[in-house]
């Protein structure tokens, strides 16, 4: 999978408020799938679909503990998205700085 495809998967996964809430919960520590599903007014099957999307984007990792599935957040994928956003932000700041400089020169 290309870096662009990986980033697309990460950003698409982050676009959904339920998936963001799951990641926020996992920021407090590992959790069982059933525990993650509890606060949502949707079926366990729907929560499982959201979790699979997060897994495909490498935002969460699953491991088995007996019969239970335990999830943890993968900060590496979040860091990749943050790095891309920071690069984009730096480019826009540079463009805005050049525009401000050009406007200042016109006023002088």
Descriptions of predicted regions:
Residues 1-6, 24, 79-108:
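Amphipathic alpha-helical dimerization/coiled-coil segments
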Residues 2-45, 68-83:
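N-terminal helix-turn-helix DNA-binding core of bacterial DNA-binding proteins
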Residues 12, 24, 55, 61, ...:
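A cross-family signal for key residues in well-ordered alpha-helices
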Residues 51-52:
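Short, hydrophobic-biased segments on the C-terminal half of alpha helices
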Residues 55-66, 70-72:
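Beta-hairpin "wing" of winged helix-turn-helix
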């Amino acid at each position: 999978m290309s870096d662009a495809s990986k980033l697309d998967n990460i950003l698409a996964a982050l676009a959904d408020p339920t998936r963001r809430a799951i990641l926020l919960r996992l920021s407090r520590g590992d959790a069982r799938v059933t525990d993650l599903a509890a606060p949502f007014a949707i079926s366990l099957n729907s929560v499982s679909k959201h979790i699979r999307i997060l897994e495909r984007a490498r935002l969460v990792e699953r491991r088995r503990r007996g019969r239970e599935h335990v999830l943890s957040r993968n900060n590496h994928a979040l860091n990749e998205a943050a790095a891309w956003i920071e690069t984009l932000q730096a480019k826009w700041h540079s463009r805005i700085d050049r525009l401000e400089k050009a406007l200042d020169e016109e006023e002088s």
